[in-house]
Amino acid sequence: MFTIGLTGGIGSGKSAAAERFAELGVPVIDTDVIAHELTRPGSRALDVIRASFGEAVIAADGSLDRPVLRRRVFVDPAARRQLEAILHPLILHEVKARLASLSGPYAVAVIPLLVETGAYDAPVDRIAVVDCPEELQIARTIARSGLTPDEVGAILAAQAARPARLAVADDVIVNTGSLAALRDQVDALHQRYLTLAANRLP
């Protein structure tokens, strides 16, 4: 299936873009959602994370304490690479399985760390980047998440720089204005992707 890899930094508007694609009837696979599913209590991935990072990253109810783990991996590059080595092969396997089960002209795979991880070797045909200035990313993330400016800064520092994302983009969704403006851009891309999918060689 013709597949779009949708990416962008924290607070860029990936979720809003993905929601619009879904409203247009496009199958959307979100790797963040998959990561949450893979780390449910009792899962093999959570057992490996516990063994690798210790009980400090496990909440009292046995679930993954995501804020604790996030703080750790965003200040420790080695820990971040270790976590990625655990999760990314599992995520890639699940993305491929879900894509294989879909029907329709095209699908969207939301991959926040597409650039940072070399796309997980993800089976994407095109890359769409949701883009905005860093100051907007920071303001939006603080407003929605309650993270401190320092915590947001650490996340941004661990992500690919804006120029690196734009360098790999086939399409750019500029999210510096209203939600309506973002949705209009997604609508235009939807028509383009339908055409590209229809004209794709078997």
Swiss-Prot record:
InterPro entries: Depp_CoAkinase, P-loop_NTPase. It is found in: Cytoplasm. ATP binds at G11, S12, G13, K14, S15, A16. Residues 3-200 form the DPCK domain. Its main location: cytoplasm. One of its GO terms (biological process) is coenzyme A biosynthetic process. One of its GO terms (cellular component) is cytoplasm. Keywords: ATP-binding, Coenzyme A biosynthesis, Cytoplasm, Kinase, Nucleotide-binding, Transferase. Its EC number is 2.7.1.24. Pathway: Cofactor biosynthesis; coenzyme A biosynthesis; CoA from (R)-pantothenate: step 5/5. HAMAP family: Dephospho_CoA_kinase. NCBIfam families: dephospho-CoA kinase (TIGR00152). This is Dephospho-CoA kinase. The lineage of its organism: Bacteria, Pseudomonadati, Pseudomonadota, Betaproteobacteria, Nitrosomonadales.
